[in-house]
Regions:
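A structured beta-alpha segment of the ubiquitous adenosine-cofactor-binding alpha/beta core
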Residues: 50-64, 222-287
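Short, ordered loop/turn segments at secondary-structure junctions
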Residues: 9, 40-43, 73, 117-120, ...
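An N-terminal-biased, well-structured beta-alpha scaffold segment characteristic
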Residues: 3-104
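Adenosine-phosphate binding glycine-rich loop
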Residues: 111-168, 291, 296-332
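Glycine-rich phosphate/diphosphate-binding loop of Rossmann-like nucleotide-binding domains
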Residues: 10-41, 153-259
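ADP-ribose/adenylate-binding Rossmann-like module
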Residues: 81-116, 262-322
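Phosphate/diphosphate ligand-binding glycine-rich loop within oxidoreductases
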Residues: 67-149
């Protein structure tokens, strides 16, 4: 079998890659009956020469490969008919913005495997960006808040950024006394919590967060699904039922919207689940939220300020009150 690592073709560009030069070289040696080649790319985090130095073949054409691995959605024009592609497709939730990609793959006779739905024998996902998305998501959100308020400055991350550099940047500034809400308690949420704990943000209980008007230092809480929704007919919340039948629940986010300065969305959402912030909610003069870091980035999903994906890893929204009306601006 011949396996190809594709050049990332989505706009905006993504410099991540499925396998490093060392990993490709190891796999080629360990499985001599199979071969992995890498499509030439000038945007990848690893250069072509770094792969060549490990004895990996760099090619321009992948048409003789059996399986093609990428990271983000492949550009429709780059799709090779009758191949098996593996990447994060963002189509399983029937996302409207990728409908044309799905149609193109069907028309071209392509077999598609989505990393997001690969699980082990225990039904646990084997591949996820989660934790790192939460880490970077918090940084971008706090960076956006600083730009909005002009109270501090954080540099925009680039390819040279490491976790240590990110944490050092946050530790070097004086962060304001704001209340941060993290929704969800999965990998993304844990990454966000890691950063906030590192910078010694105070963790509040849900009751403390909702009952405390102002805080003396940067503070946060984590709201799980049972605190964000209520079951219709006032029935008891059931996590398995919510997962299988989210349409039987409605949003209880209003109380959080009145108590939160910065919202970091780290929850899982599907089209049948409740919307937490509608367009009408965003116009409400009682809305306290001034910054949204939507790490989930579901377009017009649970947060209706997310109109498109941004040039960064998350979609950041600032909400400005002008004569009791709200306008939304994306920061990149």
């Amino acid at each position: 079998m011949k396996i190809g690592i594709i050049k990332e073709t989505k706009t905006p560009v993504d410099n991540r890659v499925a396998l490093t030069p060392e990993q490709v070289a190891t796999l080629n040696k360990q499985y001599p009956n199979h071969r992995i080649v890498v499509q030439s790319s000038d945007i990848r985090a690893f250069t072509d020469d770094e792969y060549r130095e490990k004895g990996v073949e760099i090619v321009d054409n992948l048409s003789d490969c059996d399986i093609l691995f990428g990271i983000k959605e492949a550009n429709i024009e780059s799709l090779i008919p009758n191949k098996h592609y593996v990447f994060f497709g963002h189509i399983a939730k029937m996302q409207a913005y990728n409908r044309h990609l799905l149609q193109a793959m069907i028309e071209k006779g392509i077999t598609f495997s989505d990393y997001e739905y690969l699980v082990d024998d225990n039904k646990e996902r084997v591949c996820a960006f989660g934790w790192w998305a939460g880490v970077v998501g918090v940084y971008y959100t706090l960076r956006g808040y600083g730009l909005r308020t002009k109270s501090y400055y954080l540099p925009k991350p680039d390819i040279t950024f490491t976790l240590e550099k990110l944490l050092n940047n946050l530790s070097a500034i004086s962060l304001p006394a704001v209340k941060i809400l993290i929704t969800g308690n999965g990998r993304v949420s844990h990454g966000a919590q890691y950063v906030l704990n590192y910078i010694k943000a105070r963790q509040l209980s849900e009751n403390e967060f909702l009952s405390t008007e102002n805080v003396n230092s940067i503070s946060y809480t984590v709201a799980k699904a049972e605190s964000l929704v209520k079951k219709n007919n006032n029935e008891t919340f059931d996590s398995l039922d919510f997962k299988n039948n989210p349409q039987n629940y409605h949003s209880d986010f209003g109380r959080w919207a009145k108590s939160t300065d910065i919202l970091i969305c780290a929850h899982f959402w599907t089209a049948k689940a409740p919307v937490y912030l509608t367009s009408e909610d965003l116009q409400d003069a009682k809305l306290r939220i001034r910054m949204i870091g939507d790490v989930t980035c579901d377009i017009m999903g649970s947060i209706h300020s997310t109109l498109r994906s941004s040039l960064t890893l998350i979609h950041t929204t600032i909400i400005i009150q002008l004569q009791k009306k709200k306008s939304r601006h994306s920061l990149v």
